[in-house]
Amino acid sequence: MQSEISLGRRVKKFLPVTIAAVTIGCAGMDTGEMLKTTVQGIAGTGPYSNQNVVATYYVTKQHVHIATRKLGKGMVAAVTALGIKNDVDVPQFITDAKVANGSDALTAKAQKENTEIMNFSKKASKAIAKKLDKPFTLSAAAKKELAAAMRLVRMGQILNSRAASGGILMAQRIATRDPMQDLKQAASANPAVFAVSMINNILEAPTDIKNFTDNFKKVTAGFDKIKETESTKDVEVAKKEALEKEVDKETETAISKDMKSMRG
């Protein structure tokens, strides 16, 4: 009963933040998905069940990282299917790297590449919008490629929604817990985690996540218009439930090991 009361107080305290962050971070998500992700974030269930601030930070950054990779792969597939790949500069590492790899989410290399992916995706989105302005036809192979693109971007949207919830939860836990104490607890289980400089990253994380999800929303909102185009109406994509399960499966390995090692 006490935990329910405590949860209720936390929900009330952070409700305005919750609404803002989820509205920004869930482009392309339906109401049911947004509600599910928001409740998971506030209650600390699902991928955020660990109450350690450091672990919450790490898993949220992993969601950001993998969402970005999904988006990049999806955009490459989209411009390829639409025959406009030569109109944009595609970073080579997007096609070389594994799309779901959360283990290097905090590295400088990964963050640099993620910035490149988002910049490429913005340009690709503009090129796609220009292509959609005029009627066009697609071969069977191109439709298959476009379906793959839509599927990848959709998975990125799911992960982006989860990252938005992670940002909400970060703000809550920073306000109610001692990040330095959590960092020390995490270090006791995994000495490599301990770095005083990480505290600044943790304190800035809620704002950083909000900025990321806002940016992601702008890119994917334009991409979603592909589904409204006459030439692409018959493109098949996987069902939402199947994508949710695939996202869970792909991220579980990347997240669970680190969550366990940081549990204080």
Go through each PLM region and give its residues.
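Bacterial N-terminal signal peptides that target proteins for export
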Residues: 2-15
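Generic surface-pattern signal
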Residues: 16, 76, 80, 84, ...
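C-terminal motif of bacterial Sec signal peptides marking the signal peptidase cleavage site
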Residues: 22-25
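Immediate post-signal-peptide N-terminus of mature secreted/exported proteins
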Residues: 28-104, 261-264
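Extended amphipathic alpha-helical interaction segments
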Residues: 110-264
